[in-house]
């Protein structure tokens, strides 16, 4: 109803001038009939002298001549205005060559949440609300962010850390941590958490009056030092044959086979068949404790082939034959039969390529890391969690493990949102992908980033230059950037990035002042003022941008040229190790503290209990001090 009323009021306002013309001419025509004079000029002079008499009565005259004269005058004025406007020139003074300008406080105000913690911190003065459904839908923006900054521009300090320091009540974090410094500097703050609140937003206290805290559950995958990592088993998250195909695809995309043949289409398809068959068998037939990469390696090692004996059957062949007798249409059997169509020599080449692709799992530490699972990836959207993924910024040997985790994470969270939570996770999951180019390729990421918004998932893609994204995702890079409503540029000098940013900032119109000095027989001077267009910020200006400044572009809003966020002004800065080394987070101690003994109700085992000086005595006699626990 409000828009209709507003439109009607606007129409009335536009018609007012013509109503006034009709009224004035109507009243003057009525008075003119009573004016005496020998000529028209005399009568008009009398009319002007007695002009106020026409308006003694407010209502217009209803005589025919007065009505006709008023109507003709109003229509005539309307026609003049209409045709003049239709044929008139369109001027946009000050915007002849472009209307670009920097945004201000008024431009960003509708996008900021009044509760400071419920915002994404972008610059010192600009923030974006975490609320995905604001009161006015026109201010809704997705929370996907592209952060671009060269080495040393402060991507971690000015963007990643401020997000973690916010610690909103209903947000979980997944953080890529190059070198493993972020968890050390911010982990203690997250493990402490924030005051727990009730439904009304009131802080809860225990019986002693102390504030009840809501800590983050810390998870760590460390591909630099496996001893500081929790266990991650990709097999644990297989729920169906569809998940098997996704896992195999991730392995194939992020690892390399052996020799020239491994890159050919036939060989990769053959490898995929074997992986699907073996992983399918392990998932459906192997006990839970054997569902891991170690078992997969054992299967490949046992898949012996003999070129001279096509009838030879290895141990794996016998297992699949037995399974085929019981379930002829089993997924693993169907895949394995296709693989077995290859001749002995071809099968041997396939096995060599598979072995080379999984060569990193020959390392005992990696097999141990993937032997069972502690990550609970599917529960990150159900509980307050901070998952740190530590990767090396110099060696990408184990980055395929990280790519596997991210691929499974996105799919698991989307499936859980749809199947359990009616399309929206209770905790918004913010994925902060620092050094995104080092992670590897996440399959179908261009499609995932377009659909995760509605499930309460967002991704911050942090790069050194836009060309890094194009190198990995090729043509899909533009789709990925197009699905990020926010772009934050912290500085850099890569030419392609500077060119694209300069173009998207647009052009402004500036005044140009020229002088001329002509010398000849008679000397003359000239001054010339004109307008021209100039980039809001040219490539060379972007390249020498102040180190404390950044550029923020939010969809549908003018760009902002602002100071980078100063973390020392944040109220939780004192909880970081940046402020005090005592706040450093020790991962090993936390992992020991979090260890839980999981008991099987039907399993019996011996529990040995030792106390102080009795330790040496107890070690010499196994049966003393033993309790039988059920």
Indicate residue ranges for each PLM-predicted region.
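N-terminal pre-Walker A segment at the start of P-loop NTPase domains
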Residues: 105-136
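Single conserved hydrophobic/aromatic residue that forms the stacking wall/gate
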Residues: 2-9, 13
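Alpha-helical membrane-embedded segments
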Residues: 63-87
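Membrane-interfacial helical/loop segments at transmembrane boundaries in membrane proteins
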Residues: 24-60
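P-loop NTPase motor domains
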Residues: 22, 89, 136-457, 472, ...
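Canonical alpha-helical transmembrane segments of integral membrane proteins
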Residues: 11-27
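Conserved ATP-driven motor cores of ASCE-family P-loop NTPases powering translocation/secretion/packaging/pilus
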Residues: 449-551
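Juxtamembrane/interface segments at transmembrane-helix termini
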Residues: 24-35, 78-99
């Amino acid at each position: 109803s409000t828009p209709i009323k507003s439109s009607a009021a606007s129409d009335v306002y536009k018609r007012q001038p013509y109503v006034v013309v009709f009224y004035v001419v109507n009243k003057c025509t009525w008075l003119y009939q009573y004016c005496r004079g020998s000529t028209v000029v005399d009568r008009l002079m009398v009319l002007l002298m007695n002009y106020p008499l026409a308006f003694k009565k407010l209502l217009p005259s209803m005589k025919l001549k007065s009505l006709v004269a008023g109507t003709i005058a109003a229509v005539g004025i309307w026609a003049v205005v209409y045709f003049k406007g239709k044929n008139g020139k369109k001027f946009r003074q000050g915007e002849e060559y472009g209307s670009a300008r920097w945004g201000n406080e008024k431009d960003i105000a509708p996008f900021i949440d009044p509760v400071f913690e419920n915002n994404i911190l972008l610059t010192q003065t600009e923030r974006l609300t975490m609320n995905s459904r604001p009161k006015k839908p026109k201010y809704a923006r997705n929370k996907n962010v592209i952060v671009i900054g060269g080495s040393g521009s402060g991507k971690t300090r000015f963007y990643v850390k401020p997000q973690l320091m916010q610690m909103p009540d209903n947000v979980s974090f997944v953080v890529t941590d190059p070198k493993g410094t972020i968890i050390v500097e911010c982990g203690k703050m997250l493990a402490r958490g924030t005051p727990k609140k009730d439904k009304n937003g009131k802080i809860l206290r225990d019986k002693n009056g102390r504030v009840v805290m809501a800590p983050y559950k810390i998870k760590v995958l460390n591909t630099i030092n496996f001893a500081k990592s929790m266990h991650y088993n990709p097999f644990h998250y297989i729920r169906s044959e569809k998940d098997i195909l996704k896992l195999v695809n991730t392995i194939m995309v992020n690892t390399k086979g052996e020799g020239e043949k491994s890159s050919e289409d036939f060989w990769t398809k053959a490898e995929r068949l074997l992986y699907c068959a073996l992983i399918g068998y392990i998932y459906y037939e192997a006990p839970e404790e054997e569902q891991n990469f170690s078992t997969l390696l054992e299967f490949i090692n046992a898949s012996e082939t003999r070129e001279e004996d096509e009838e030879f059957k290895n141990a794996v062949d016998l297992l699949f034959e037995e399974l085929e007798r019981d379930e002829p249409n089993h997924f693993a059997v169907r895949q394995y039969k296709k693989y077995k169509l290859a001749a002995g020599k071809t099968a041997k080449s396939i096995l060599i390529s598979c072995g080379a692709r999984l060569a990193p799992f020959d390392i005992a530490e990696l097999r141990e890391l993937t032997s069972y699972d502690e990550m609970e990836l599917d529960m990150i959207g159900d509980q307050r969690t901070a998952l740190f993924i530590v990767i090396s910024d110099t060696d990408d040997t184990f980055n395929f493990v990280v790519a596997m985790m991210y691929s499974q994470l996105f799919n698991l969270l989307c499936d859980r949102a749809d199947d359990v939570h009616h399309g929206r996770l209770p905790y918004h999951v913010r994925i902060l992908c620092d050094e995104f180019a080092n992670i590897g390729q996440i399959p179908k990421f261009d499609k995932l980033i377009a659909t995760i918004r509605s499930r309460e998932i967002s991704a911050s893609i942090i790069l050194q230059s836009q060309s890094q994204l194009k190198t990995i995702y090729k043509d899909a890079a533009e789709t990925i950037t197009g699905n990020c409503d926010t772009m934050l540029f912290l500085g850099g000098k890569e030419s392609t990035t500077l060119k694209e940013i300069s173009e998207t900032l647009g052009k402004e119109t500036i005044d140009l002042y020229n002088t001329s000095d002509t010398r000849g027989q008679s000397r003359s001077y000239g001054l010339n003022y004109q307008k021209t267009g100039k980039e809001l910020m040219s490539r060379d200006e972007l390249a020498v941008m102040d180190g404390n400044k950044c550029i923020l572009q939010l969809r549908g809003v003018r760009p902002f040229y602002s100071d980078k966020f100063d973390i020392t002004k944040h109220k939780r800065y004192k909880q970081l190790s940046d402020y005090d080394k005592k706040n450093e987070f020790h991962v090993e101690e936390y992992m020991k503290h979090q260890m839980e003994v999981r008991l099987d109700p039907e399993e019996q085992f011996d529990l040995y209990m030792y106390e102080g000086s009795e330790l040496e005595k107890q070690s010499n006699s196994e049966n003393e001090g033993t309790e039988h626990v059920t």
